[in-house]
UniProtKB/Swiss-Prot annotation:
Biased composition (Basic and acidic residues): 314-329
Native species: Rattus norvegicus
InterPro entries, per database record: SYCE1
GO biological process, one term: synaptonemal complex assembly
Record function comment: Major component of the transverse central element of synaptonemal complexes (SCS), formed between homologous chromosomes during meiotic prophase. Requires SYCP1 in order to be incorporated into the central element. May have a role in the synaptonemal complex assembly, stabilization and recombination.
Compartments (UniProt record): Nucleus; Chromosome
Assembly and oligomerization: Homodimer. Found in a complex with SYCP1 and SYCE2. Interacts with SYCP1, SYCE2 and SYCE3. Interacts with SIX6OS1.
Pfam families to which the protein is assigned, alphabetical: SYCE1 (PF15233)
Family the UniProt entry places it in: Belongs to the SYCE family.
Protein's recorded name: Synaptonemal complex central element protein 1
Amino acid sequence: MATRPQPLSVEPEGSADLLHGPEGARGRRGSTQKIEDLMEMVEKLQKVGSLEPRIEVLINRINEVQQAKKKASEELGEAQTVWDTLQKEVDSLHEEKVRLKDILNRKEETLRIMQLHCQEKESEAERKHSMLQECKDRISFLNNQIDNEKAKLRRLRLDFEEHLETLMSQHKDTMEFHKPEHLTEEMSVLDSSKEQLLKEEKLIKAKLEDVQHRLCALCGPEGSSTFSDGLFLRSHEAAAAMQMFKDENKKAEELLEAAAQQHQQLQQRCRQLQQKRQRLKEELEKHGVQILAQIQSTQKEEDSSWRTASPKPLEAHKETVQERPSSRT
Protein backbone atom coordinates (compact mmCIF):
# COMPACT_ATOMS: atom_id res chain seq x y z
CA MET A 1 0.00 0.00 0.00
CA ALA A 2 1.49 3.29 -0.99
CA THR A 3 2.33 5.90 1.56
CA ARG A 4 -0.07 8.73 2.05
CA PRO A 5 1.31 11.89 0.60
CA GLN A 6 1.58 14.90 2.88
CA PRO A 7 -0.30 18.05 2.12
CA LEU A 8 1.62 20.37 -0.09
CA SER A 9 2.12 23.61 1.78
CA VAL A 10 5.43 24.78 0.33
CA GLU A 11 5.55 28.46 -0.61
CA PRO A 12 8.26 30.08 -2.69
CA GLU A 13 10.72 32.47 -1.12
CA GLY A 14 9.68 36.06 -1.09
CA SER A 15 6.03 35.17 -1.66
CA ALA A 16 5.04 37.10 1.46
CA ASP A 17 6.82 40.13 0.14
CA LEU A 18 5.20 39.79 -3.28
CA LEU A 19 1.68 39.70 -1.91
CA HIS A 20 1.33 43.44 -1.52
CA GLY A 21 -0.34 44.43 -4.71
CA PRO A 22 -3.66 43.49 -6.24
CA GLU A 23 -2.10 41.12 -8.85
CA GLY A 24 0.00 39.31 -6.21
CA ALA A 25 -3.12 38.80 -4.13
CA ARG A 26 -4.98 37.34 -7.08
CA GLY A 27 -2.07 34.91 -7.89
CA ARG A 28 -1.84 33.78 -4.25
CA ARG A 29 -5.58 33.15 -4.09
CA GLY A 30 -5.43 31.09 -7.35
CA SER A 31 -2.51 28.86 -6.25
CA THR A 32 -4.04 28.30 -2.80
CA GLN A 33 -7.34 27.31 -4.41
CA LYS A 34 -5.59 24.75 -6.61
CA ILE A 35 -3.73 23.24 -3.65
CA GLU A 36 -6.94 23.03 -1.67
CA ASP A 37 -8.63 21.30 -4.63
CA LEU A 38 -5.78 18.75 -4.77
CA MET A 39 -6.00 18.13 -1.04
CA GLU A 40 -9.73 17.60 -1.28
CA MET A 41 -9.20 15.21 -4.20
CA VAL A 42 -6.57 13.24 -2.21
CA GLU A 43 -8.87 13.01 0.77
CA LYS A 44 -11.70 11.78 -1.46
CA LEU A 45 -9.45 9.17 -3.04
CA GLN A 46 -8.28 8.03 0.37
CA LYS A 47 -11.85 7.63 1.46
CA VAL A 48 -12.76 5.74 -1.67
CA GLY A 49 -9.58 3.61 -1.54
CA SER A 50 -8.54 4.15 -5.10
CA LEU A 51 -5.45 6.32 -4.45
CA GLU A 52 -2.81 4.13 -6.06
CA PRO A 53 -4.25 3.83 -9.56
CA ARG A 54 -4.39 7.55 -9.85
CA ILE A 55 -1.03 8.49 -8.30
CA GLU A 56 0.40 9.34 -11.65
CA VAL A 57 -2.51 11.56 -12.30
CA LEU A 58 -1.87 13.26 -8.99
CA ILE A 59 1.82 13.64 -9.75
CA ASN A 60 0.95 15.18 -13.08
CA ARG A 61 -1.53 17.40 -11.40
CA ILE A 62 1.07 18.37 -8.79
CA ASN A 63 3.56 19.13 -11.51
CA GLU A 64 0.99 21.20 -13.26
CA VAL A 65 0.20 22.94 -10.01
CA GLN A 66 3.89 23.60 -9.37
CA GLN A 67 4.33 24.92 -12.88
CA ALA A 68 1.23 27.05 -12.43
CA LYS A 69 2.58 28.19 -9.08
CA LYS A 70 5.94 28.96 -10.65
CA LYS A 71 4.22 30.82 -13.43
CA ALA A 72 2.07 32.61 -10.89
CA SER A 73 5.24 33.47 -8.93
CA GLU A 74 6.80 34.85 -12.09
CA GLU A 75 3.65 36.75 -12.86
CA LEU A 76 3.58 37.89 -9.27
CA GLY A 77 7.19 39.08 -9.59
CA GLU A 78 6.36 40.90 -12.78
CA ALA A 79 3.27 42.32 -11.12
CA GLN A 80 5.41 43.36 -8.14
CA THR A 81 7.88 44.99 -10.51
CA VAL A 82 5.04 46.75 -12.24
CA TRP A 83 3.64 47.62 -8.82
CA ASP A 84 6.99 49.06 -7.73
CA THR A 85 7.23 50.98 -10.96
CA LEU A 86 3.70 52.24 -10.52
CA GLN A 87 4.44 53.04 -6.88
CA LYS A 88 7.47 55.04 -7.96
CA GLU A 89 5.36 56.77 -10.56
CA VAL A 90 2.72 57.42 -7.90
CA ASP A 91 5.41 58.84 -5.61
CA SER A 92 6.79 60.97 -8.42
CA LEU A 93 3.27 62.04 -9.31
CA HIS A 94 2.65 62.84 -5.66
CA GLU A 95 5.83 64.91 -5.58
CA GLU A 96 4.78 66.51 -8.86
CA LYS A 97 1.37 67.15 -7.33
CA VAL A 98 2.97 68.78 -4.28
CA ARG A 99 5.27 70.81 -6.53
CA LEU A 100 2.40 71.82 -8.80
CA LYS A 101 0.28 72.64 -5.78
CA ASP A 102 3.09 74.82 -4.47
CA ILE A 103 3.40 76.45 -7.89
CA LEU A 104 -0.39 76.86 -7.98
CA ASN A 105 -0.32 78.52 -4.56
CA ARG A 106 2.45 80.82 -5.70
CA LYS A 107 0.58 81.57 -8.91
CA GLU A 108 -2.62 82.23 -6.99
CA GLU A 109 -0.72 84.54 -4.64
CA THR A 110 0.86 86.26 -7.63
CA LEU A 111 -2.58 86.49 -9.27
CA ARG A 112 -4.05 87.99 -6.11
CA ILE A 113 -1.19 90.49 -5.92
CA MET A 114 -1.64 91.32 -9.61
CA GLN A 115 -5.38 91.78 -9.10
CA LEU A 116 -4.73 94.11 -6.19
CA HIS A 117 -2.14 95.92 -8.29
CA CYS A 118 -4.64 96.18 -11.16
CA GLN A 119 -7.29 97.51 -8.80
CA GLU A 120 -4.82 100.08 -7.49
CA LYS A 121 -3.90 101.02 -11.06
CA GLU A 122 -7.58 101.33 -11.99
CA SER A 123 -8.28 103.49 -8.94
CA GLU A 124 -5.18 105.56 -9.74
CA ALA A 125 -6.31 105.90 -13.35
CA GLU A 126 -9.80 106.97 -12.22
CA ARG A 127 -8.27 109.47 -9.81
CA LYS A 128 -6.00 110.84 -12.54
CA HIS A 129 -8.96 111.00 -14.92
CA SER A 130 -10.99 112.93 -12.36
CA MET A 131 -8.01 115.22 -11.72
CA LEU A 132 -7.60 115.70 -15.47
CA GLN A 133 -11.29 116.55 -15.81
CA GLU A 134 -10.99 119.00 -12.92
CA CYS A 135 -7.92 120.55 -14.57
CA LYS A 136 -9.81 120.86 -17.85
CA ASP A 137 -12.76 122.48 -16.07
CA ARG A 138 -10.38 124.80 -14.22
CA ILE A 139 -8.60 125.67 -17.48
CA SER A 140 -11.90 126.41 -19.24
CA PHE A 141 -13.01 128.53 -16.26
CA LEU A 142 -9.71 130.43 -16.28
CA ASN A 143 -9.94 130.90 -20.04
CA ASN A 144 -13.45 132.32 -19.68
CA GLN A 145 -12.26 134.52 -16.84
CA ILE A 146 -9.31 135.71 -18.95
CA ASP A 147 -11.64 136.44 -21.87
CA ASN A 148 -13.97 138.36 -19.55
CA GLU A 149 -11.04 140.29 -18.08
CA LYS A 150 -9.75 141.06 -21.57
CA ALA A 151 -13.20 142.27 -22.65
CA LYS A 152 -13.49 144.31 -19.45
CA LEU A 153 -10.02 145.76 -19.98
CA ARG A 154 -10.88 146.53 -23.59
CA ARG A 155 -14.08 148.30 -22.52
CA LEU A 156 -12.16 150.23 -19.87
CA ARG A 157 -9.54 151.20 -22.42
CA LEU A 158 -12.19 152.35 -24.88
CA ASP A 159 -14.00 154.31 -22.15
CA PHE A 160 -10.72 155.84 -21.06
CA GLU A 161 -9.85 156.77 -24.64
CA GLU A 162 -13.30 158.30 -25.20
CA HIS A 163 -13.14 160.19 -21.91
CA LEU A 164 -9.59 161.28 -22.69
CA GLU A 165 -10.61 162.50 -26.13
CA THR A 166 -13.56 164.37 -24.60
CA LEU A 167 -11.35 165.97 -21.97
CA MET A 168 -8.72 166.84 -24.55
CA SER A 169 -11.32 168.38 -26.86
CA GLN A 170 -12.80 170.35 -23.95
CA HIS A 171 -9.36 171.46 -22.87
CA LYS A 172 -8.49 172.38 -26.44
CA ASP A 173 -11.68 174.38 -26.87
CA THR A 174 -11.11 176.09 -23.55
CA MET A 175 -7.52 176.89 -24.43
CA GLU A 176 -8.50 178.14 -27.88
CA PHE A 177 -11.37 180.26 -26.56
CA HIS A 178 -9.51 181.57 -23.52
CA LYS A 179 -6.00 182.12 -24.68
CA PRO A 180 -3.79 184.48 -22.67
CA GLU A 181 -3.66 186.81 -25.69
CA HIS A 182 -7.45 186.92 -25.83
CA LEU A 183 -7.68 187.56 -22.11
CA THR A 184 -5.02 190.23 -22.45
CA GLU A 185 -7.00 191.88 -25.24
CA GLU A 186 -10.17 191.80 -23.13
CA MET A 187 -8.28 193.24 -20.17
CA SER A 188 -6.82 195.98 -22.38
CA VAL A 189 -10.30 196.76 -23.75
CA LEU A 190 -11.63 196.95 -20.20
CA ASP A 191 -8.73 199.17 -19.18
CA SER A 192 -9.32 201.43 -22.16
CA SER A 193 -13.04 201.59 -21.39
CA LYS A 194 -12.20 202.34 -17.79
CA GLU A 195 -9.82 205.12 -18.84
CA GLN A 196 -12.48 206.49 -21.16
CA LEU A 197 -15.00 206.47 -18.34
CA LEU A 198 -12.52 208.24 -16.09
CA LYS A 199 -11.95 210.84 -18.79
CA GLU A 200 -15.68 211.30 -19.17
CA GLU A 201 -15.96 211.65 -15.41
CA LYS A 202 -13.25 214.30 -15.46
CA LEU A 203 -15.05 216.13 -18.26
CA ILE A 204 -18.29 215.99 -16.29
CA LYS A 205 -16.51 217.34 -13.23
CA ALA A 206 -14.99 220.11 -15.35
CA LYS A 207 -18.44 220.94 -16.70
CA LEU A 208 -19.81 221.00 -13.16
CA GLU A 209 -17.04 223.37 -12.07
CA ASP A 210 -17.74 225.55 -15.10
CA VAL A 211 -21.42 225.58 -14.18
CA GLN A 212 -20.55 226.49 -10.62
CA HIS A 213 -18.28 229.30 -11.85
CA ARG A 214 -21.09 230.55 -14.04
CA LEU A 215 -23.45 230.41 -11.11
CA CYS A 216 -21.01 232.36 -8.99
CA ALA A 217 -20.59 234.92 -11.77
CA LEU A 218 -24.34 235.25 -12.07
CA CYS A 219 -24.74 235.75 -8.32
CA GLY A 220 -22.99 239.16 -8.39
CA PRO A 221 -22.04 240.93 -5.11
CA GLU A 222 -22.44 239.17 -1.81
CA GLY A 223 -25.23 241.45 -0.54
CA SER A 224 -27.67 240.42 -3.18
CA SER A 225 -26.49 236.78 -3.39
CA THR A 226 -29.56 235.31 -1.73
CA PHE A 227 -32.00 236.99 -4.03
CA SER A 228 -29.87 236.22 -7.09
CA ASP A 229 -29.47 232.57 -6.04
CA GLY A 230 -33.18 232.22 -5.68
CA LEU A 231 -33.79 233.77 -9.04
CA PHE A 232 -31.13 231.65 -10.75
CA LEU A 233 -32.34 228.44 -9.15
CA ARG A 234 -35.81 229.19 -10.36
CA SER A 235 -34.61 229.98 -13.89
CA HIS A 236 -34.81 227.54 -16.81
CA GLU A 237 -31.02 227.54 -17.37
CA ALA A 238 -30.34 226.36 -13.82
CA ALA A 239 -32.94 223.63 -14.14
CA ALA A 240 -31.49 222.53 -17.49
CA ALA A 241 -27.95 222.60 -16.10
CA MET A 242 -28.97 220.56 -13.04
CA GLN A 243 -30.83 218.07 -15.19
CA MET A 244 -27.86 217.78 -17.53
CA PHE A 245 -25.57 217.37 -14.55
CA LYS A 246 -27.77 214.65 -13.07
CA ASP A 247 -28.03 212.85 -16.38
CA GLU A 248 -24.31 212.98 -17.02
CA ASN A 249 -23.54 211.88 -13.48
CA LYS A 250 -26.03 209.06 -13.67
CA LYS A 251 -24.70 207.97 -17.05
CA ALA A 252 -21.11 208.07 -15.78
CA GLU A 253 -22.04 206.08 -12.69
CA GLU A 254 -23.85 203.49 -14.80
CA LEU A 255 -20.95 203.20 -17.19
CA LEU A 256 -18.48 202.94 -14.35
CA GLU A 257 -20.62 200.37 -12.57
CA ALA A 258 -21.06 198.37 -15.79
CA ALA A 259 -17.32 198.48 -16.45
CA ALA A 260 -16.53 197.43 -12.89
CA GLN A 261 -19.12 194.66 -13.05
CA GLN A 262 -17.80 193.47 -16.40
CA HIS A 263 -14.26 193.59 -15.08
CA GLN A 264 -15.33 191.61 -12.03
CA GLN A 265 -17.18 189.09 -14.21
CA LEU A 266 -14.13 188.66 -16.40
CA GLN A 267 -11.89 188.13 -13.39
CA GLN A 268 -14.36 185.64 -11.92
CA ARG A 269 -14.63 183.85 -15.26
CA CYS A 270 -10.87 183.76 -15.53
CA ARG A 271 -10.63 182.22 -12.05
CA GLN A 272 -13.36 179.70 -12.93
CA LEU A 273 -11.54 178.75 -16.11
CA GLN A 274 -8.30 178.31 -14.20
CA GLN A 275 -10.08 176.16 -11.59
CA LYS A 276 -11.77 174.16 -14.34
CA ARG A 277 -8.44 173.70 -16.08
CA GLN A 278 -6.83 172.53 -12.83
CA ARG A 279 -9.78 170.22 -12.12
CA LEU A 280 -9.63 168.74 -15.62
CA LYS A 281 -5.91 168.23 -15.24
CA GLU A 282 -6.36 166.51 -11.87
CA GLU A 283 -9.23 164.41 -13.22
CA LEU A 284 -7.13 163.41 -16.21
CA GLU A 285 -4.26 162.41 -13.95
CA LYS A 286 -6.64 160.58 -11.62
CA HIS A 287 -8.28 158.61 -14.44
CA GLY A 288 -4.89 157.84 -15.90
CA VAL A 289 -3.65 156.49 -12.56
CA GLN A 290 -6.85 154.45 -12.09
CA ILE A 291 -6.61 152.97 -15.57
CA LEU A 292 -2.95 152.14 -15.07
CA ALA A 293 -3.73 150.54 -11.69
CA GLN A 294 -6.55 148.50 -13.25
CA ILE A 295 -4.26 147.43 -16.08
CA GLN A 296 -1.55 146.42 -13.62
CA SER A 297 -4.02 144.47 -11.44
CA THR A 298 -5.43 142.76 -14.52
CA GLN A 299 -1.91 141.90 -15.63
CA LYS A 300 -1.15 140.44 -12.19
CA GLU A 301 -4.34 138.35 -12.28
CA GLU A 302 -3.52 137.15 -15.77
CA ASP A 303 0.03 136.25 -14.67
CA SER A 304 -1.24 134.30 -11.66
CA SER A 305 -3.86 132.50 -13.76
CA TRP A 306 -1.26 131.85 -16.44
CA ARG A 307 0.97 130.07 -13.91
CA THR A 308 -1.82 127.66 -12.94
CA ALA A 309 -3.29 127.17 -16.40
CA SER A 310 -2.40 125.06 -19.46
CA PRO A 311 -0.71 126.19 -22.72
CA LYS A 312 -4.07 127.61 -23.82
CA PRO A 313 -3.97 130.33 -21.12
CA LEU A 314 -0.35 130.88 -22.16
CA GLU A 315 -1.54 131.85 -25.64
CA ALA A 316 -4.17 134.12 -24.11
CA HIS A 317 -1.46 135.72 -21.95
CA LYS A 318 0.72 136.27 -25.02
CA GLU A 319 -2.21 137.89 -26.80
CA THR A 320 -2.78 140.15 -23.78
CA VAL A 321 0.91 141.06 -23.71
CA GLN A 322 0.74 141.92 -27.41
CA GLU A 323 -2.29 144.16 -26.78
CA ARG A 324 -0.62 146.07 -23.93
CA PRO A 325 1.65 148.31 -26.06
CA SER A 326 -1.32 149.41 -28.19
CA SER A 327 -3.34 150.22 -25.06
CA ARG A 328 -0.46 152.20 -23.59
CA THR A 329 0.04 154.15 -26.82
